[in-house]
Amino acid sequence: TVIRKSYDDNITSSDVNARDFFDDRFYLNPTTSHDSLRVMRLENKVFIRLQPWKSDGIISKLDVGLGDKLLNYFAFEPDSYISGGSNKVFNSVYLYAGAQGQYDKYLQWNAKGQYTFLGHEINDFGIEANVSFSAYPFRRHRTSPLTLNAHFETTLKEPDYYQQHMLTNHYRWDNDFGKISTTRLEASVSV
């Protein structure tokens, strides 16, 4: 996947509205902007899927695999004045696993996890789990379930390159953030 974004403008020194829009921040050129960002992501996976029992069993599928993620970022940097624009390339290798199953029409579940053991995003991980319980309490509509859904997710991830570094005509930062931890628990009921 390749994502490109280009931005051009010409703002005169007397254009008060346009200058106020950017809080009068012009880091590279006071009247003209031409900013370009590009991200390329290439991901390869090798996995094996096991179906230990029947397809609608309590454990119906097990997945185990190995993945390789290549990220290529292009952005302007102060060194670009001397050497021209350059790409920043990061590679990471990870293990992932998942499982899913169900019990009749009353229970469905799935879970997956990923751990990066080599490369730029070393020690990143993510765990995600979903469960759905269904009951059929309605006498007149015996096939209409009352369903409780729950979702749990936790991640620890390296910030991406643009969260850490940015130099455009109107925005500039150079940070050294640590890993970002996110935990989410959601539940819903449907009738």
Cite the ranges covered by each PLM segment.
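Exposed, low-structure sequence patches enriched in small/polar residues
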Residues: T1-V16, D24-R25, N29-V191
